[in-house]
Swiss-Prot record:
Active-site positions on this chain: 50 (nucleophile)
Keywords: NADP, Oxidoreductase, Porphyrin biosynthesis
Superkingdom of source: Bacteria
Catalytic reaction equation(s): (S)-4-amino-5-oxopentanoate + tRNA(Glu) + NADP(+) = L-glutamyl-tRNA(Glu) + NADPH + H(+)
InterPro entries found in the cross-reference section: 4pyrrol_synth_GluRdtase, 4pyrrol_synth_GluRdtase_dimer, 4pyrrol_synth_GluRdtase_N, GluRdtase_CS, GluRdtase_dimer_dom_sf, GluRdtase_N_sf, NAD(P)-bd_dom_sf, Shikm_DH/Glu-tRNA_Rdtase
Subunit structure and binding partners: Homodimer.
Domain notes: Possesses an unusual extended V-shaped dimeric structure with each monomer consisting of three distinct domains arranged along a curved 'spinal' alpha-helix. The N-terminal catalytic domain specifically recognizes the glutamate moiety of the substrate. The second domain is the NADPH-binding domain, and the third C-terminal domain is responsible for dimerization.
Protein name, entry field: Glutamyl-tRNA reductase
Extra facts: During catalysis, the active site Cys acts as a nucleophile attacking the alpha-carbonyl group of tRNA-bound glutamate with the formation of a thioester intermediate between enzyme and glutamate, and the concomitant release of tRNA(Glu). The thioester intermediate is finally reduced by direct hydride transfer from NADPH, to form the product GSA.
Organism field: Glaesserella parasuis serovar 5 (strain SH0165) (Haemophilus parasuis)
Length: 435
């Protein structure tokens, strides 16, 4: 059995590559279907955010040893599929992608969910994104009449519990540090007084909600929201309890013409704000400074807009400097969190081994019971035919002993051949032998 984590993130790939491998709209559904049809995994969870795209495969038929030929072939098959679904050159992808298996994969997932692998150390939004990814996987497999495999499901439930423990036992989440906070911090570096600015927020998801809260906390009073669905933007305005002008995406130009600061975070696969739209807005605004912050992957704002005069344009990658300033205070807490992750990942694999041994014992007992019933049936038949009782019982006990010991004997021979000293010692101890 093998659990494989495969993907890229902000540490290994640029925004341009990350946006190419984002699972947007129907691509996620196609991925689930292709993985099922190609038997790549019994279950998979697809995590796709601004800063990472990762897939967590569970394949019980693949041996866990990374050097095993079947394991190597399977990894290559998964990589080839990943490149193909995104129509990427394998050489380009191979420079940025990574894979982790079993214990290492469990540690990685837990680290991701705890915010230890995030662009902003300890940011809390990623946990919600991991939960959403798991929920989408559950929905797909339930639609197929099954569910996420027991082992992969258990790993994610353990991950959620670990993240909760990290939040409660460390100070990693004590300060409001996130992508949204970094975007707000960038705006404060360029503009002094938020009370006099007009903000245009594009999108109405969790990240934009956090951006809006940070802006309001720093004095913003004039906020516009543009979103694909009017009702969702309206709900956000009610939630934030502040009057906001709500625009449709088709009316983005109206908002741009008025905005000093534009912050975008949607799931759109296409550019929403072009260079020409910004140029037109600047003419309306008499070329007053405008800040464009695009925290969406794929991009919402044409990167060429940053070439215009009086425009300050930043992408997710450009937030790195602000983020670095906030990392130092979380390093100590992160070290504590890493210890918790190591402990919990180890605990998960203890459970996994117990589960595997329980299943093994169950199957062995079932096999033994089948042997017993088969030999008993033959013995009873022999007795009914008038054969000597003692002879029948001797034959029954002899065959029963031989057949029941056949599998353990093979296992012992395999352990000796593979130099499995611990296994042999455990068996010897169970039999109360000296050596």
């Amino acid at each position: 059995m093998t659990i494989l984590a495969l993907g890229i993130n902000h540490k290994t790939a640029s925004v341009s590559l990350r946006e190419k491998v984002a699972f947007v709209e129907d691509k996620r559904q196609r991925a689930f279907e292709q993985i099922r049809d190609q038997s790549l995994a019994e279950s998979v969870v697809i995590l796709s955010t601004c800063n990472r795209t990762e897939l967590y495969f569970h394949q019980p038929k693949i041996p866990p040893q990374e050097e095993h030929p079947d394991n190597i072939a399977w990894r290559e098959q998964c990589f080839n599929w990943f490149a193909e679904i995104h129509q990427l050159d394998k050489e380009e992808l191979s420079e940025a992608y990574y894979f982790k298996q079993n214990l290492e994969a469990a540690r990685h997932l837990m680290s991701v969910a705890c915010g230890l692998d995030s662009l902003i150390l300890g940011e809390p939004q990623i946990l919600g994104q991991v939960k959403q990814a798991y929920q989408e996987s559950e929905e797909f497999y339930h639609s197929q009449g099954s569910g996420v495999s027991t082992n992969l499901s258990r790993l994610f439930q353990k991950t959620f519990a670990t993240a909760k423990r990290v939040r409660s036992e460390t100070e990693i989440g004590s300060s409001a540090v996130s992508v949204a906070y970094a975007a707000c911090g960038l705006a404060r570096q360029i503009f002094d007084d938020f009370t006099k600015l007009r903000f245009l927020l594009v999108g109405a998801g969790e990240t934009i909600e956090l951006v809006a809260r940070h802006l309001i906390n720093h004095g913003a009073k004039n906020i516009m929201i543009a979103n694909r669905t009017h009702i969702r933007a309206e709900m956000l305005a009610v939630k934030l309890d502040i009057p906001m002008q709500i625009l449709s995406l088709s009316a983005l130009q109206i908002g741009l013409n008025q905005a000093d600061v534009v912050i975008c975070s949607t799931g759109s696969p296409d550019i929403l704000i072009t260079k020409e739209m910004v140029e037109q807005a600047q003419k309306q605004r008499r070329f007053d400074p405008m800040l464009l912050i695009d925290i969406a992957v794929p991009r919402d704002i044409d990167e060429k807009a940053g070439e215009l005069d009086s425009i300050y344009a930043y992408s997710v990658d450009d937030l790195q400097n602000i983020i670095q300033q906030n990392i130092a205070q979380r390093q100590q807490a992160a070290e504590q969190a890493k210890e918790i992750v190591i402990e919990e990942a180890k605990d998960f694999f203890v459970w996994l081994k117990q589960q595997q041994s329980t299943n093994l014992i169950k199957h062995y007992r079932q096999n033994a019971e089948e042997i017993r019933l088969d030999l008993l049936e033959k013995a009873l038949s022999a007795l009914q035919q008038g054969q000597d009782c003692e002879k029948v019982l001797n034959e029954l006990s002899y065959k029963l002993t031989n057949q029941l010991l056949h599998i353990p004997t093979q296992a012992l021979q395999a352990m000796a051949k593979n130099s499995n000293v611990k296994g042999l010692q455990s068996f010897s101890k169970a039999l109360k032998l000296e050596e």
